[in-house]
């Protein structure tokens, strides 16, 4: 923190802040959700982080963003894993179901192999749509190769 912000913060202060925030984070992560979301975007973002040993490693942050029936965006969940995979997405979808989500009308996802099958196993009536951003990125590869 001192390098980034110019402020020195003691280990006791960091522990006190963490102790106050963790219960709120746990409550947010386990809160009940709406039963239906018309649209849900699911994607993982990869970050370099420092692990317990002080080594720089890459971790996947799984993000689930939904549009509720009133048209408002809601961050439904954030999950951390070593890497992105359909099996972990299945556990994310199961968590959403356990927290009250009964149906997703449209799931916007990247082209990860096995991801549509994971969605269909938990939400069999959900239409799966490849995210427009991912469609453009994938198309550009072929355009550049053709030039």
Each language-model region and where it sits:
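RNase H-like nuclease fold core
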Residues: 2-11, 16-109, 113, 117, ...
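Generic structural signal of hydrophobic/aromatic residues within well-ordered alpha-helices
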Residues: 21, 28-29, 136-139, 143
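Short, surface-exposed amphipathic charged segments that create phosphate/polyanion-binding patches used
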Residues: 57, 141-147
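Short acidic (Asp/Glu) and glycine-rich catalytic loops that position anionic groups and cofactors
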Residues: 71-72, 132, 147
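Inter-helix linker motif
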Residues: 123-141
